[in-house]
Amino acid sequence: MMAAASPTRAGQAAETQALEYLQGQGLQLLARNWRCKGGELDLVMLDADTVVFVEVRYRLHAGFGGALDSIDGRKQKRLVLAATLFLQKEAHWGNYPCRFDVVALQGSHHAGRPLQWLKNAFEC
Protein backbone atom coordinates (compact mmCIF):
# COMPACT_ATOMS: atom_id res chain seq x y z
CA MET A 1 0.00 0.00 0.00
CA MET A 2 1.41 3.42 -0.99
CA ALA A 3 1.47 6.24 1.50
CA ALA A 4 -0.46 9.36 0.62
CA ALA A 5 1.59 12.17 -0.86
CA SER A 6 2.76 14.70 1.70
CA PRO A 7 1.33 18.21 1.48
CA THR A 8 4.78 19.43 0.42
CA ARG A 9 5.01 16.92 -2.42
CA ALA A 10 1.45 17.65 -3.51
CA GLY A 11 2.25 21.37 -3.54
CA GLN A 12 5.43 20.82 -5.55
CA ALA A 13 3.52 18.68 -8.06
CA ALA A 14 0.86 21.39 -8.36
CA GLU A 15 3.57 24.02 -8.93
CA THR A 16 5.17 21.89 -11.62
CA GLN A 17 1.83 21.40 -13.36
CA ALA A 18 1.10 25.13 -13.17
CA LEU A 19 4.57 25.99 -14.50
CA GLU A 20 4.24 23.63 -17.45
CA TYR A 21 0.78 24.99 -18.24
CA LEU A 22 1.90 28.62 -18.10
CA GLN A 23 4.97 27.92 -20.21
CA GLY A 24 2.63 26.29 -22.72
CA GLN A 25 0.71 29.58 -22.77
CA GLY A 26 3.91 31.44 -23.68
CA LEU A 27 5.09 32.71 -20.28
CA GLN A 28 8.79 32.50 -19.41
CA LEU A 29 10.07 31.49 -15.99
CA LEU A 30 12.13 34.12 -14.16
CA ALA A 31 12.22 32.50 -10.69
CA ARG A 32 10.70 29.57 -8.83
CA ASN A 33 10.19 29.45 -5.05
CA TRP A 34 11.86 32.83 -4.59
CA ARG A 35 12.25 33.32 -0.85
CA CYS A 36 12.76 36.44 1.21
CA LYS A 37 12.13 37.62 4.74
CA GLY A 38 8.62 38.68 3.73
CA GLY A 39 7.57 35.32 2.32
CA GLU A 40 7.85 33.28 -0.85
CA LEU A 41 6.84 33.70 -4.47
CA ASP A 42 5.88 30.38 -6.04
CA LEU A 43 6.54 31.43 -9.63
CA VAL A 44 7.77 34.68 -11.14
CA MET A 45 7.17 34.74 -14.86
CA LEU A 46 7.31 37.06 -17.82
CA ASP A 47 4.20 37.42 -20.00
CA ALA A 48 5.32 39.50 -23.00
CA ASP A 49 6.50 42.67 -21.19
CA THR A 50 4.72 42.03 -17.87
CA VAL A 51 6.28 40.50 -14.76
CA VAL A 52 3.75 38.05 -13.34
CA PHE A 53 3.82 36.90 -9.72
CA VAL A 54 2.00 33.57 -9.65
CA GLU A 55 0.61 32.04 -6.49
CA VAL A 56 -0.15 28.34 -6.93
CA ARG A 57 -2.87 26.99 -4.66
CA TYR A 58 -3.78 23.34 -4.33
CA ARG A 59 -6.63 21.85 -2.35
CA LEU A 60 -7.64 18.21 -2.33
CA HIS A 61 -11.19 19.04 -1.23
CA ALA A 62 -13.28 22.20 -1.15
CA GLY A 63 -14.53 21.42 2.37
CA PHE A 64 -12.82 24.45 3.90
CA GLY A 65 -13.16 26.57 0.78
CA GLY A 66 -11.57 25.99 -2.57
CA ALA A 67 -8.08 26.83 -3.69
CA LEU A 68 -9.09 30.27 -4.97
CA ASP A 69 -10.85 31.06 -1.69
CA SER A 70 -7.60 30.54 0.21
CA ILE A 71 -6.09 33.84 -0.99
CA ASP A 72 -7.25 36.16 1.78
CA GLY A 73 -6.21 39.75 2.47
CA ARG A 74 -3.33 38.67 4.71
CA LYS A 75 -1.93 36.37 2.01
CA GLN A 76 -2.29 39.13 -0.58
CA LYS A 77 -0.28 41.53 1.60
CA ARG A 78 2.50 38.95 2.00
CA LEU A 79 2.61 38.40 -1.76
CA VAL A 80 2.78 42.14 -2.42
CA LEU A 81 5.61 42.50 0.11
CA ALA A 82 7.55 39.60 -1.42
CA ALA A 83 6.98 41.00 -4.93
CA THR A 84 8.22 44.42 -3.81
CA LEU A 85 11.37 42.85 -2.38
CA PHE A 86 11.87 40.82 -5.57
CA LEU A 87 11.66 43.98 -7.68
CA GLN A 88 14.13 45.74 -5.38
CA LYS A 89 16.61 42.87 -5.54
CA GLU A 90 16.09 42.22 -9.26
CA ALA A 91 16.09 45.90 -10.17
CA HIS A 92 16.23 45.29 -13.94
CA TRP A 93 12.55 44.19 -13.73
CA GLY A 94 11.55 47.26 -11.72
CA ASN A 95 10.23 49.31 -14.65
CA TYR A 96 8.12 46.52 -16.10
CA PRO A 97 4.39 46.42 -15.48
CA CYS A 98 3.43 43.62 -13.11
CA ARG A 99 0.38 41.67 -12.03
CA PHE A 100 -0.63 38.98 -9.56
CA ASP A 101 -2.11 35.76 -10.92
CA VAL A 102 -3.40 32.70 -9.11
CA VAL A 103 -3.33 29.19 -10.49
CA ALA A 104 -5.70 26.97 -8.55
CA LEU A 105 -5.77 23.19 -8.67
CA GLN A 106 -8.30 21.10 -6.85
CA GLY A 107 -8.92 17.39 -6.61
CA SER A 108 -6.76 14.30 -6.59
CA HIS A 109 -3.05 14.55 -7.32
CA HIS A 110 -3.38 12.64 -10.59
CA ALA A 111 -2.30 14.33 -13.81
CA GLY A 112 -5.06 16.08 -15.66
CA ARG A 113 -6.74 17.55 -12.62
CA PRO A 114 -8.62 20.74 -13.43
CA LEU A 115 -6.55 23.91 -13.39
CA GLN A 116 -7.90 27.46 -13.09
CA TRP A 117 -5.73 30.41 -14.10
CA LEU A 118 -6.98 33.70 -12.74
CA LYS A 119 -5.12 36.64 -14.26
CA ASN A 120 -5.02 39.85 -12.23
CA ALA A 121 -6.38 37.95 -9.25
CA PHE A 122 -6.07 41.03 -7.04
CA GLU A 123 -4.87 44.63 -7.19
CA CYS A 124 -2.15 46.09 -5.03
Curated annotation (Swiss-Prot):
Coiled-coil ranges from the UniProt annotation: none
SUPFAM superfamilies to which the protein is assigned, alphabetical: Restriction endonuclease-like
GO molecular function annotation: nucleic acid binding
Source organism of the structure: Pseudomonas putida (strain ATCC 47054 / DSM 6125 / CFBP 8728 / NCIMB 11950 / KT2440)
Family: Belongs to the UPF0102 family.
Signal peptide: none
Protein name per its UniProtKB record: UPF0102 protein PP_1324
